[in-house]
Amino acid sequence: MAIVSDVPLGGGLSSSASLEIAVSVLLEQLLKVEMTPEDRALLCQAAEHNFAHMPCGIMDQFISSCGQKGSLLLIDCRSNKGELVSMNDPSVSIIVCNSNNKHQLTGSEYPDRVKQCKDAVTILQAKYPEVKALRDATIEQVESMKEEMGDVVYRRALHVVSECQRCLDCKEALVAKDYKRAGQLLYQSHESLKNNFEVSTPEIDTLVEIASHQDGVYGARITGGGFGGCIVCLVDSVKADEVIKALEKQYKEKTGIECTCFVTSPSQGARVLKAYEVDEVVKAAPTCECKCPMKKLVKSVPFWVGLATTAAAVSYFVMRRKN
């Protein structure tokens, strides 16, 4: 099996979930196993929990498996159901900007935050037994238990509870095409991720700060697991090229690091590629690090599974079947 990918590793663009989901689709085809996109996402999440020992949520696997072209996905992590939210207005674009400061989730930072959120629920339940998860709590309830939680657990809970509401508010703003409001929510989200959940970095904060001063930018925030990686910007399509130039220039001046930016749009999740799609895959296939012509490899194999992530980075998983 040859794996060809241009999803940046450690960029917060679901590189691990992309691999998990696409390999699952490949195995389903080989073994003739029928699986719903939702079940596939849950299976791959379990693989990351049990074999990579990373207590990740379901978001990355869910969008990689269930994503639809032209739509965002509002995920209910209790019912494991998704609601499509149209995002195909040509007047707005999404820019992904990679800080090229790779995030690291192999330490205790992520598991620590999972535990802190669980601790917050336990503390809340002493007074509010109806709270089964932080999504059930209100800001007022969290504030009332601030002393019992302590500063760190309080701020973690405050972020999660407020972020749940921001997700719902952002959905309404996007449906109404109120991009100014959606952008404000992105900025608020980033501030909370920075100050309350503490998963941002100086480089990421620099990118968001630069973006916030550019004409045509509605909003920006860190994306992915945090501790490095990428930001996403919601921008006026007419201004997209100018915004990218400003980000690249000013980020290099401020940090000495070159960032990588591209315009993207929501795309379909993992699927088996049809014969007529092969030419598109060949055109998009990158050259691997050893400089060998991967496009020749892609042309030579008869079995295809492709995955397009929400960041519009595309992974191609190809397998040469022996006769």
Each PLM stretch: what is its role?
Residues 71-219, 234-306, 316-317:
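C-terminal nucleotide
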Residues 1-88, 240, 262, 268:
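Gly/Ser-rich oxyanion-binding loop with an adjacent helix/lid
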Residues 17-24, 56, 114, 163-167, ...:
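Short alpha-helical patches at coil-to-helix transitions and adjacent helical residues
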Residues 6-23, 216-234:
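Glycine/serine-rich anion-binding loops at beta->alpha junctions
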Residues 1, 91-93, 229:
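Residues at beta-strand starts and edge strands
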Residues 317-323:
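Hydrophobic single-pass membrane-insertion segments
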